[in-house]
Structures are given as structure tokens and as C-alpha cells.
Amino acid sequence: MAKYEILYIIRPNIEEEAKNALVARFDSILTDNGATIVESKDWEKRRLAYEINDFREGLYHIVNLEATDAVALNEFDRLSKINGDILRHMIVKLDA
């Protein structure tokens, strides 16, 4: 299984319950498509290098996971581009 890290930035003015629901939804998207989540945690609220969608800060969330193929990653990528609560995301394959 290959190891991956996903970092995504959530808009800063989201309510705590909505943020938790968003994180749970995207975690379930990954697990439903065959990935195994090793760790999913909030990093911190950070200032952005440049303004994104009129926001100067964002809530960073990190997910470490293992996957045998790219199905879960492709679905996460597709749905996170559509979702207005996620400002940016990045998927990185970690060295074995």
C-alpha cells in the first residue's frame, strides 16, 4: 500500500459543527473508496500567503492515509474542488 498525505484548507468562518461534519464526510469518502486513514487531525488556523476567496486565514487539516490505488484520491480531489468550504487542497505521495 502506498502512503499519502492530504492537506486541505477550510474556510475560517465555518461553524465548529459544520467543520466536524465536513471532516467526517471527507474522511468517509476516502474510506468508502478503499483507503485506510492512519491519522486525521486539525493542524491550526494559519494566515494565508495570499488571499483566497476573500479570506486571509484558513483552518488547516491533515490526513495521513494508505491506499492501494488512486480511486479514493481521485474522488476526494473531485469532490473537494466542488465544495465551497474547502479553499485549497494538496495530495502528496510519501516515500515508502
Curated annotation (Swiss-Prot):
Gene Ontology cellular-component annotations: cytoplasm; ribonucleoprotein complex; ribosome
The entry's keywords: Ribonucleoprotein, Ribosomal protein, RNA-binding, rRNA-binding
Stored Pfam families: Ribosomal_S6
Gene Ontology BP annotations: translation
GO molecular function, one term: small ribosomal subunit rRNA binding
InterPro entries: Ribosomal_bS6, Ribosomal_bS6_sf, Ribosomal_S6_plastid/chlpt, Transl_elong_EF1B/ribsomal_bS6
Stated role: Binds together with bS18 to 16S ribosomal RNA.
UniProt-listed NCBIfam families: S6 (TIGR00166)
Family: Belongs to the bacterial ribosomal protein bS6 family.
Protein name: Small ribosomal subunit protein bS6
Organism whose genome encodes this protein: Streptococcus equi subsp. equi (strain 4047)
Record lineage: Bacteria, Bacillati, Bacillota, Bacilli, Lactobacillales
